[in-house]
Amino acid sequence: MEQVQTPGPPVSGVGQRAAANGWVLETNSLTKQFGPLTAVDDLNIKLQQGEVLGFLGPNGSGKSTTVGMILGLVRPSRGTVRIAGKINQEHPEIVSQTTGAIIENPAFYPYMSGRDNLRALAIAAGNVPDQRIEDLLRLVNMSERAGSKYKTYSLGMKQRLGIAATLVTDPAIVILDEPTNGLDPAGQREIRGIIPRLAEEGHAVLLASHMLHEVEQVSDRVAIIRRGKMLREGRVGDLLAQGEYLEVGVDAAEIDRARDVLARMPWVEKVDVRDGTLHVAAPADAGSAINRTLVENGVFASRIAAQRNTLEELFLELTEINADAGETGEAQA
């Protein structure tokens, strides 16, 4: 079993590469149309150094198209991408100078070692000291296997080497698109341990992932999109605090009556039934009022407890609400 090595000293020399307004990456009214289809619709995203932004959306929501426009691979129909204050379409060199990205499965020479693969990238980039390669291998917990041929690596090891490869040129922005896709739980945990360190060392990390619990654990902020439109953006803690509710347990035979009784109370915003319990959107100190109201109507509450939504619950609630709104023009990228 591979052992997780103790992280070494910081490996980043990321300088002050943000624009004067503090954002290292900023999209303004970013829009992409493919014929009649609008894949990305007036999207505004901001990212500063030293933070992780979780970029979330269902399949076909426009995440990949957005990443393509940030990297200069897809030309916007309207709007701009600013990297370190410069519009990437006007200054295409700014992308290679400041951005590292791992999209799907990274490609390496199979008969070369992990260390030599990174050295090859360093030679191509120029002015990368040998010590940086060793520091990066230590950062991604690959020092012990760095001399082995790439073709002998597990999927998790290949993914970690891919992250190291994005850091060879010490980019200000690191884009990780589904970095734990296909990994076993141990591999996912390894990647989760690496991502916060990137932010701690000054990198701005854009994390596109379907692993909602993973994003919740490592992100400072999240941006949730559907059909190319922004649904919600903000700090993880603030968004989850908005989803606080009271969970009320009642007998299954009484659950519909309890829901109807509570829904009539002026201090209750909403009542849902989930997994056989009532989820009541009401002030956190409303537990005694809920209990009293139910008793007065002949319903016994077996449990009343304050809860808060997980990021997964918030994501599902937002995307389901917008799906029910009957939007048209489903994005495909």
Which residues does each predicted region cover?
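ABC-family P-loop ATPase nucleotide-binding domain
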Residues: 1-31, 321-333
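ABC transporter nucleotide-binding domains
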Residues: 22-27, 32-226, 232
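A general structural signal for well-ordered secondary-structure junctions
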Residues: 53, 108, 143, 173, ...
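Generic structural signal for isolated residues within well-ordered alpha-helices
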Residues: 94, 120, 135, 238, ...
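A short, structure-level motif marking secondary-structure boundaries and short turns
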Residues: 104, 117-119, 179-180, 242-245, ...
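Short, hydrophobic secondary-structure boundary micro-motifs
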Residues: 111, 303, 326-327
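ABC transporter nucleotide-binding domain
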Residues: 192-281
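Short, charged/small-residue-rich alpha-helical element at the C-terminal edge
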Residues: 245-321, 333
